[in-house]
Design a protein with these regions (language model features):
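Conserved alpha-helical substructure of the radical SAM core
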Residues: 12-133, 318-322
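Short cysteine clusters
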Residues: 55, 59-62, 265-268, 284, ...
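Acidic (Asp/Glu)-rich catalytic clusters
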Residues: 88-91, 116, 131-135, 139, ...
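Secreted/processed peptides and extracellular or luminal domains of membrane proteins
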Residues: 61, 65-68, 271, 290, ...
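Radical SAM enzyme [4Fe-4S]-AdoMet core and its adjacent flexible, acidic
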Residues: 1-7, 71, 142, 148-290, ...
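Hydrophobic faces of well-ordered beta-strands that scaffold small-molecule active sites
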Residues: 47, 97-99, 121-123, 139-141, ...
């Protein structure tokens, strides 16, 4: 049997094309960041869509199921298309959509259609289901603590399954997201060591936000939150390519700065948040029952960083110096 010699020219051509595509993506990212720096975050440039009111888990700290969704009728895909078309016609910038829920992958057909309306897409999933190879998508997989803490927060017996799912998709831009609570607060460094090598998109941390109907005991008081932020900043120096958060964002989450950010929440003022019925959720993706004064969601603090020219210049100088 004759063996075909490898087509060297073809391989060089493919490698060249991949390199050009990478440069193009970096250029587009730089262009978008420059626009944000010059003009600020446009209204409705970013937002969240609850894909579904269904989920295969019931996690201890889930803000979504703190509310009753049993009698909700999910908006059909056809109606979602009409809604997204109307948003586009109204000249919404459509820069980034975060697809949440519920478990978004229960209804991945909606994301498959809807993601084409946005330049960038983030899908927040529990990671128990298969992950499609969609371009221009960041996958955020919720891993709240190391295995024992995770079992208490989410469900026993699925931690290793999710880990294998991440390992089997090295081609995807997967971030690990951990919510720090009274159960997971001692897991930070172990989580970074375990998941850092396999999460291409790095690790991000949130703090539990009290929501009506959820266990108040999960919340970490301000001194503990400040201590953990200092620990994360220390670990960032030790694992610079692993923790995917700006220093300025972490500093804004501290007790002496957080209220100024949440009182002027960029998400509440500029983003959209739509529920499974297609209706507006209120002040943010967590709904109107979230305690904004104790918000631990990284999103408004990250948006506040991006909206500040001073902080963005500070981050740029820091990056150039490193």
């Amino acid at each position: 049997m004759q063996t075909r010699a490898p087509n060297v020219e073809s391989n060089v051509y493919l490698t060249h094309n991949v390199h050009l595509m990478s440069i193009r993506r970096q250029f587009i990212k730089l262009r978008d960041i420059t626009k944000l720096f010059v003009f600020g975050i446009p209204k409705f440039a970013i937002g969240s869509i609850d894909v579904t009111n269904r989920c295969n888990l019931r996690c201890e700290h889930c803000y979504f199921f703190a509310e009753d969704h049993n009698n909700e009728r999910e908006l059909s895909i056809e109606k979602w298309i009409e809604k997204l078309d109307a948003m586009k016609a109204a000249v919404h910038p459509m820069m980034l959509c975060t697809w949440v829920g519920g478990e978004p992958m229960v209804r991945k057909q909606l994301i498959e259609v809807g993601r084409s309306y946005f330049k960038h897409n983030t899908i927040v999933t529990n990671g128990t289901m298969d992950l499609p190879d969609w371009p221009n998508c960041t996958w955020v997989i919720s891993i709240d603590g190391t295995e024992d803490a995770f079992a208490r927060m989410r469900a026993p017996g699925i931690y290793q399954k999710i880990k294998q799912n991440v390992i089997s998709h090295p081609e995807l831009n997967i971030q690990i997201s951990c919510v720090l609570t009274s159960i997971t607060r001692d897991c930070v460094e172990d989580l970074v060591r375990e998941w850092g090598p396999i999460a291409r998109g790095g690790i991000i941390f949130d703090f539990f936000t009290p929501v009506t109907g959820l266990d108040e005991a999960l919340w970490l008081d301000w001194p503990e939150r400040d201590r953990l932020i200092d620990e994360i900043l220390r670990l960032k120096k030790q694992y610079p390519a692993t923790i995917n958060m700006l220093d300025s964002t972490l500093e804004l989450m501290k007790s002496d700065k957080a209220k100024k950010v949440t009182d002027n929440c960029e998400f509440r003022l500029k983003a959209f948040a739509l529920g499974p019925t297609g209706e507006d959720k209120g002040k943010c993706m967590m709904g109107n029952n979230a305690d904004c004064d104790r918000c631990g969601c990284v999103v408004p603090f990250h948006m506040a960083t991006i909206a500040s020219r001073r902080l963005m210049l500070k981050e740029a100088v820091k990056r150039l110096a490193s």
